[in-house]
Each structure stands twice: as structure tokens, then as C-alpha cells.
Amino acid sequence: MRSILQLRVPQIAGDEDQLRGLKIETTAASSPSVVRFRDPQIEMAHGAGGKASRRLVEGLFAPLLYPASREPLSDAAHLEVGGARIAFTTDSFVVKPLHFPGGSIGELAVNGTMNDLAVSGAKGIAMTVTFVLEEGLPTADLEAEVRAMSGALKRAGVVMAGGDTKVVERGKADGMYITTAGIGTPLPGVKVDARSVRPGDKILLSGPIGDHGITILLARGELDFEADLYSDTRSVLPLVEALAAECGPGIHWMRDPTRGGVATALNELARDSGLGIELLEEEIPMHDAVRGACELLGLDPLHIANEGQFLAVVSPEYAAIALNSLQQTAGGEEARIVGQVRVEPANAVLVITRYGGSRIVDMLVGDPLPRIC
């Protein structure tokens, strides 16, 4: 891969002294070199972002690739090299179909990568892309995705720094897969860490849940159900920047609830913080079409993927300010305070239903909606 962008980060490549001083602040938690993953083979659920994914990462990848780290899992790594700070992330996109109401794989690849940086407390500045293309893919389809990606880059103010292309035999890639990497610069005054979360903190959600996952399901024609529904794929950076400007020191944690949905993201927070999460079901914004589809299929909307929303945990004194900043920013009009952090139930998420009851909601188990991003 050839890079066409020179970054103003001192001597990251080629300087052994600087590389020895590389500090990775956010990677995966593990016990050094102890491989605990015992599943006999890889299943679709291992890529769904839920329990099986976490078991794979913590049991196999983390012990061998990050043996010295004790940091919680995060959407991006924040690196310090010679006094300069950058954020770094990587992602892959295998969504099926390639085009869907409200977006496509190319636009999703840019937005998803930049959103991982945004919720880590950074503004994306550059990315790279690798296309894995299937032999026989119509050139018009590829051009459409590159154009979609170009548009998303311009809207985000991000430079494409380089890329690579591979072609595999017919029938081996379902059209195309896209892998990205992104770098960004930290937002001033924002430091998110699950270990900073405290009992009494408030949980905010930027908008309606489930649009993306249900849109993809409908686009596949697998459900005899019609709805005027669109993927929510978009950049969340404007909302994150608005939140940071008003209450940066009060932001303790952020996450975009993609694979595995809101339930999985908040279960990860509960386990990484050792605290409990209380969600108010009646406060969670959701379109009627999403609710109806989930009821028809027996799915929990809290497990459905989103691609243009994010969760934020803020200290209670900033809650009203944070909510107002989101609701006054384009795309955040339906933001809500949806819950709070509690001491109990430790390491778990408790949903208070609209009827006054309660239930524990766990991480996603299995993969009810595969390849949604």
C-alpha cells in the first residue's frame, strides 16, 4: 500500500526509539499468553458483536496479540508518540445487500470508521481502505460504491490516505468486502473510559434505535413486511462535538451501538465498570416500523444494530446540558436520557418496562441478523 498523506506525528514509522516509547492506552483486556478460547470452530455468532464475539476476542486474540494490556475493550486506541496524540481504529464491512435504503457499503465504511473514532473522543482526519472484490462484479456497482465513499469522505472532511485491492474467484466474496483503518486527533477536554463511570451518572441515547438492522433485513426480502424505513448510517461527529463543547469534562463514556445493539454496548460498559445499568424502556426512542418488525420476528430491539446513533454516559450535573446540546444539533432532535448507572445489579443491565416491571437484558446471543454491517 502506498500512502499519499504525510501525518504530523513525529517519526512514527522508522524511528526505533519512538516506537519503543509507543504508549497504547486502549486495547483489549487479557491474561498474558493464556488462551481460553475453546470453541471447536468459528460460527457466524463469533462476528455478531455479542457474547461469542467477546469470548473470541478475550479468549484468543487478546492473550496473544495484547498480552501486557489490562485496558477495557474500546472502539479505538489512543496512542502517544513523542508527545503527539492520535486515535486509531480499524473495521471491516460485509453488509448484504451492498445497496440498501438510506445507504450502501461504501458510505457505511466511511461513516462506521469515523464514528468509532468519534465515540472514542477523537475527530477523524484520514483513513485507508482495502477492497476485496469478487470476480464478475459489475464495474458500475464498484463505481457506485467508490462514489458513495467519496461523498461520505467529503461530508466528514476526511482524507483517503491510501488503499489496496484484491480480487478473488467468482462466488468467494459476495460482490465485495471493504476493510478500513482510520486515524484522528483527540477532542480537547474529552477522555472516555468505562472505569470513569460512577453510580448516578446518566445515560443518553442520540436517537431512535434499530433502523439500520431492520432496514437491512427488509432489503433482503426475507420478511413479508413493508415499511417506510431507512438505514441511519451517518456521521455522529457533529453530535459528539456539540456534546464535547458543552460538557467535555462530564463525559465519562461513549459508544456507537452497532452489532449487538444498545443491550450489548451497555452490557460491555457494566462489565468493564463493575456497575449496574438501569434502562427506562418507555424513554428509548424507536420508530413504529422497527417495533412492529421486532414483535413479528420475536427480536429484542435492544439487540438490533444501529449505524448513526451513539450512547453517552455523563455525570448527573451535566445531564440536562448534554441533552439540550444534542437536541439542539441537527440529527439529535430525538435524543433522550434513557437510564442511569447504579451500584446494583453489578455487571448487568436492568430494563424497567413501560408496565412497571423489570427484566435483565444480556448481550446478544447468536446472530439473528448476520452481515448487517
Predicted segments with their positions:
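Helix-biased detector of long, well-ordered alpha-helical tracts
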Residues: 2-373
